[in-house]
Design a protein with these regions (language model features):
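Short, small-residue-biased leader/transition segments that mark boundaries at the very start
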Residues: 2-7
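FAD-binding beta-loop-beta segment adjacent to the flavin cofactor pocket
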Residues: 94-95, 131-136, 140-186
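Conserved beta-strand-loop-beta-strand element in the redox core of flavoprotein oxidoreductases
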Residues: 59, 77-97, 103
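A conserved FAD-binding loop/helix module that cradles the flavin
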Residues: 113-119, 172-174, 179-209
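A conserved beta-strand/loop element that lines the FAD pocket in flavoprotein oxidoreductases
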Residues: 65-75
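Gly/Ser/Thr-rich active-site loops/lids in small-molecule metabolic enzymes
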Residues: 117-140, 197-202
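Glycine-/small-residue-rich beta->alpha transition segments that form the dinucleotide
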Residues: 92-95, 101-113, 180
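Short beta-strand to alpha-helix junction loop
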Residues: 16-26, 40-60, 70, 188
């Protein structure tokens, strides 16, 4: 008995959790062929197969174009001179200066340590870029727990082209994308992924100009 024969004839479509096709599209194609019924995937809770699949394809494309992934490594600092990043340093390659024509800051917000704070201020930990945040700690939060919290809007200050600022001056060869940016509450608005994708696409266009 085939899957198609086992289905009631009045089914117009099948809604299926998005769990097929992690490595390639063959699983999806086979499943569609077996049921012979319009098949639509429903996105489950993250991390979803679709999201992981997209991430894998992007990384494969990155590597095929000469990109290098430093697995489990972490950028810990760098040098800015003449309003441009000269190089970055990392935990596992302490003697190497990582140099590029352009740099993209996609470190996220507080949860991923793209932003940090102490008892006095909020700061960007890698290059100490300018951060838009209140200097009064009492203004970081609201008493109402479920309201939008002021600290959720804090982030790295940039110009219109997403170049971050350092001491009020534009860092010309660096861009910031995603939830590290100021003025966007991705937690309350639940649109962090969309903003990350759109700002990344815009920055890619800026670099390719």
């Amino acid at each position: 008995l085939s899957l198609h024969d086992a289905l009631p004839i009045w089914y117009d479509a099948i809604l299926f959790p998005a769990v097929a096709g992690l490595r390639n599209a063959a699983e999806d194609e086979l499943l569609r062929k077996l049921v012979n019924t319009p098949l639509y995937y429903v996105t489950p809770m993250p991390p979803s197969v679709m999201g992981v699949r997209v991430a894998m394809l992007l990384m494969e494309n990155f590597k095929s174009n000469g990109g290098i992934e430093l697995v489990s490594n972490k950028i810990n600092g760098g040098v800015i001179e003449n309003n441009a990043v000269q190089y970055l340093t990392s935990d596992h390659l302490p003697d190497e200066k990582l140099k590029a024509n352009n740099y993209i800051l996609a470190t996220g917000s507080f949860m991923s340590q793209g932003l940090k704070s102490d008892y006095e201020h909020v700061f960007e930990p890698i290059l100490n870029l300018d951060v838009h945040a209140s200097t009064n700690r009492d203004e970081w939060i609201e008493e109402a727990v479920f309201e939008a919290q002021p600290y959720m809007h804090y982030g790295v200050a940039t110009d219109k082209a997403f170049h971050p600022l350092k001491n009020g001056k534009v860092v010309t060869n660096m861009y910031a994308v995603g939830s590290v940016l100021e003025g966007h509450n991705h937690i309350k608005q639940a649109d962090g992924t969309g903003v990350s994708l759109l700002t990344a696409l815009q920055v890619a266009k800026e670099i390719l100009k």
